[in-house]
């Protein structure tokens, strides 16, 4: 999957699971299982339940995604 093919959506982390996996409720109403991207992991950015995040979804499997960005709190 190339980066251009990925679908990028925003959502809210609802649950933290083992092995750096998270359950994310997307703005369009879907619920996906997401893992942390390498850059977030390398820079020690903490993701907690309640955080707004950007998630990349593969067009082949819309139930799994990758968290690419944690949005700022207002």
From Swiss-Prot:
PROSITE patterns: S1_IF1_TYPE (PS50832). GO terms for molecular function: ribosome binding; rRNA binding; translation initiation factor activity. GO terms for cellular component: cytosol. It is found in: Cytoplasm. Coiled coil: none annotated. InterPro entries: NA-bd_OB-fold, RNA-binding_domain_S1_IF1, S1_domain, TIF_IF1. HAMAP family: IF_1. This is Translation initiation factor IF-1.
